[in-house]
Amino acid sequence: MAKEFGRPQRVAQEMQKEIAIILQREIKDPRLGMMTTVSGVEMSRDLAYAKVFVTFLNDQDEAAVKNGIKALQEASGFIRSLLGKAMRLRIVPELTFFYDNSLVEGMRMSNLVTNVVKHDEERRVNPDDSKED
């Protein structure tokens, strides 16, 4: 029987917290003027690589998102060194940053469902109006 919550998942969870603190307190890059949230971290089994998924507060502007990811990639060495000081790991993983659009996509889907439910309620209240269309 395999472990359901192994070491890579535990390290990823702790790393997510530490990276969020580092981004909030230590990174002073003007390209990251918008609020950055670490939504998840995926670790490789050997703990040598980490995919860091981030979201931005003003993520409607695609150019700002690309600049934010680029700034994080360029600061990954600095973030990695601070991470090494904060966590006791034999190998500090190589960090790769990705934009996590699942939150935006989830909000879009929620809005679609809300609109469909509202439209359905309107049709139930006024059944004659829908037949005239």
Curated annotation (Swiss-Prot):
CC terms in the record's Gene Ontology section: cytosol
GO MF entries: ribosomal small subunit binding
Keyword ATP-binding in annotation: no
Pfam families xref list: RBFA
One BP term from GO: maturation of SSU-rRNA
Record SUPFAM superfamilies: Ribosome-binding factor A, RbfA
UniProt xrefs under PROSITE patterns: RBFA (PS01319)
Top-rank lineage group of the source organism: Bacteria
Keyword flag Cytoplasm: yes
Keywords: Cytoplasm, Ribosome biogenesis
Cellular compartment(s): Cytoplasm
Similarity annotation: Belongs to the RbfA family.
Subunit structure: Monomer. Binds 30S ribosomal subunits, but not 50S ribosomal subunits or 70S ribosomes.
Function: One of several proteins that assist in the late maturation steps of the functional core of the 30S ribosomal subunit. Associates with free 30S ribosomal subunits (but not with 30S subunits that are part of 70S ribosomes or polysomes). Required for efficient processing of 16S rRNA. May interact with the 5'-terminal helix region of 16S rRNA.
Protein name: Ribosome-binding factor A
Gene that specifies this protein: rbfA
